[in-house]
């Protein structure tokens, strides 16, 4: 779909998840997106006994990347807006007029933290550049 044909207001965007479950991406990996209504996929999962709702963005290679990963501040992409929906609308602006976008993973940041139950976990945050 061409960018000028895409209507972002038709997309349902759920809030961010507490704990991102993500595919193992590495520095140098490329993600290709083709703009369509179907690339925005609402998800629901129970994580640590709590039901979480979020939105995944599907790549052309059928990899799901959470909207919170793609709209996180300081992730290398220049996005505007305060809410995930506003920042996703800004993400759509990165697409070419033909409706395609290629991102390259430039860094994987890992942060260790202690969960409420005392167990240890690691969060992984991605940094990107438009390829």
Identify the role of each PLM range.
Residues 43, 94-95, 113:
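Oxidizing extracytosolic/periplasmic lumen-facing domains
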Residues 33-35, 100-107:
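OB-fold and OB-like beta-barrel modules that bind single-stranded nucleic acids
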Residues 65-87:
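GIY-YIG-like beta-to-alpha core
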Residues 54, 100-102, 123-125:
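Beta-strand-rich binding-surface signature
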Residues 60, 80-82, 106:
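Short His-Asn-centered micro-motif
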Residues 106-131:
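OB-fold/S1-family single-stranded nucleic acid-binding modules
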Residues 1-71, 117, 129-130:
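OB-fold ssDNA-binding interfaces and closely related basic DNA-contact patches used
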Residues 26, 82-104:
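Short nucleic-acid-contacting surface segments enriched for D/E, G, S/T with interspersed K/R
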